[in-house]
Regions:
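Hydrophobic transmembrane alpha-helices of Major Facilitator Superfamily
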Residues: 14-23, 27, 31, 81-89, ...
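Membrane-interface helix/loop boundary segments of multi-pass membrane proteins
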Residues: 28-64, 93-98
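Short, motif-level signal for alpha-helix interfacial/capping segments enriched in acidic residues
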Residues: 2-12, 50-53, 76-91
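Active-site alpha-helix of zinc metalloproteases
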Residues: 21, 25-26, 34-35, 69, ...
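Juxtamembrane helix-loop-helix connectors linking adjacent transmembrane helices
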Residues: 1-25, 43-50, 119, 124-126
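Membrane-embedded glycan transfer/ligation machinery
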Residues: 2, 21, 34, 38, ...
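Residue-level signature of transmembrane alpha-helical entry/exit and packing/kink sites
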Residues: 13-18, 54-65, 80, 84
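Functionally important transmembrane alpha-helices
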Residues: 63-74, 78-126
């Protein structure tokens, strides 16, 4: 799923690219999508919980944020984008129920696992 990075990784760029994918991207994506966008749509009070402990407005905010988040990942195929949408809903739930830091940590872990799988399948000759 990370084939779009083929050709970007050289011995000189490996550490910087891993840092960008595992740390920088999740940090700014969570700040934008779960901090700003999701936060802007959340109601001031969290009463009237319904599905999974979320109110209808929190669900709507999660869907909007997740759709926008998925749209910035168009480099993936449809299955990859469906997975990203699902992960985004999980990150949104984590943000609403437990705060932005947990959403960031989950995103870091996801990107680290994806990067590790990508690097393990690469030819050993960088």
């Amino acid at each position: 799923p990370m084939d779009f990075m083929n050709g970007m990784i050289t011995p000189d760029s490996l550490v910087l690219l891993v840092f960008a994918v595992v740390v920088v991207a999740p940090l700014y994506e969570e700040l934008i999508f779960r901090g700003v966008i999701l936060g802007a749509w959340l109601p001031p009070d969290r009463t009237n919980k319904k599905l999974l402990g979320l109110s209808p407005n929190e669900l709507k905010a999660s869907l909007i944020s997740s759709i926008l988040f998925t749209l910035i990942h168009l480099q993936y195929d449809m299955l990859g984008m469906a997975v990203i949408f699902g992960l985004s809903l999980i990150f949104s739930y984590a943000r609403i129920r437990h705060g932005l830091l947990l959403a960031m940590i989950l995103h870091f872990i996801n990107n680290a696992c994806a990067m590790l799988m990508y690097l393990l399948q690469m030819p050993t000759a960088l």
